[in-house]
Amino acid sequence: MKFTPGAVEDAPSYYVDHDNGKYNTQKCVILRNLGLEGDDIAMPASLNHLAKPTHILDLTNNDLVFFPDLHHRDDIETLLLSKNRLMVLDAALLPSKLKSLSLAFNGIENFETLIPLSHCPSTVRDLVLIGNPICHLSEYRQRILALVPSLEVLDFKLVSQAEKAQAVKDHVAVMKKIKEDNRQIHQRKKKALAAEVDGKNTFGRNTKSLTEAAKVTKPRDKTIEVMNTVVGKLTEEKKKKIREQLANASSMEELERLERLLTGGV
């Protein structure tokens, strides 16, 4: 189901003392187990109705594929997003003073998906990724700490001083590699979108899909179906404008906007 203002306003809430140890001073809002889906219209409009202050936002066990845009909220310290279907982890959308983030059981399989977490707020101290296939990969812990060197706890285990020191050293090299990888992904994604607009590529059939080009490993059947339908209905004039925007796109954000346009906001 989509987010609605009513669902947010009527969400159960209670007070806890998880972070500061002071009795019942932190408000936790519960929006879990509702099958909530993210979009660019209903979700942000509905979350504008989220009570202030809210210190803990529980969105566990929904159908979100990207982070809700909470970058303007400096009151939310804990964000619980376990058991969703997260594929796009844009850290720029996270609350500005976030301390704890749970992404457990989201089917995250590769480090590329987690690269945007390198831009997490510097306040993030606690990250949970347990239950994701990536946890079983070689050097998992070391690589995550290099991405987010501010962490003090990873998967409920304290980060040692030795780990923290190594993470700080690795961070510079990791960021350099990320920059180059992003450049290559940007080019592949731009080509894939342009091919789709030109009718030379139908996702999921005879060439590499946009999903593969962007290194997203989860199936996106609904997105593929809608994109093919939307592109098929575009006029030549509209296609020309989109081609021009693609040619001038210089950031992943611009490409994501164009992708959402072609998928009807799915």
From Swiss-Prot:
Give GO BP annotations, semicolon-separated. Answer: mRNA splicing, via spliceosome
Among the entry's GO cellular component annotations, what is one? U2-type prespliceosome
Q: Where are the LRR repeats?
A: 30-51, 53-74, 75-95, 97-118
SUPFAM superfamilies per record: L domain-like
Q: Which domain of life is it from?
A: Eukaryota
Q: What keywords sit in the KW lines?
A: Leucine-rich repeat, mRNA processing, mRNA splicing, Nucleus, Repeat, Spliceosome
Q: Which GO terms describe its molecular function?
A: U2 snRNA binding
Question: What Pfam families does UniProt report for this protein, alphabetically?
Answer: LRR_9 (PF14580)
Subcellular localization: Nucleus
Q: Which residues form the LRRCT domain?
A: 132-170
Q: What does this protein do?
A: Involved in pre-mRNA splicing.
- Note the subunit structure: Associated with the spliceosome.
Report the sequence similarity comment from the record: Belongs to the U2 small nuclear ribonucleoprotein A family.
Q: What is this protein called?
A: U2 small nuclear ribonucleoprotein A'
Q: Which organism is it from?
A: Candida glabrata (strain ATCC 2001 / BCRC 20586 / JCM 3761 / NBRC 0622 / NRRL Y-65 / CBS 138) (Yeast)
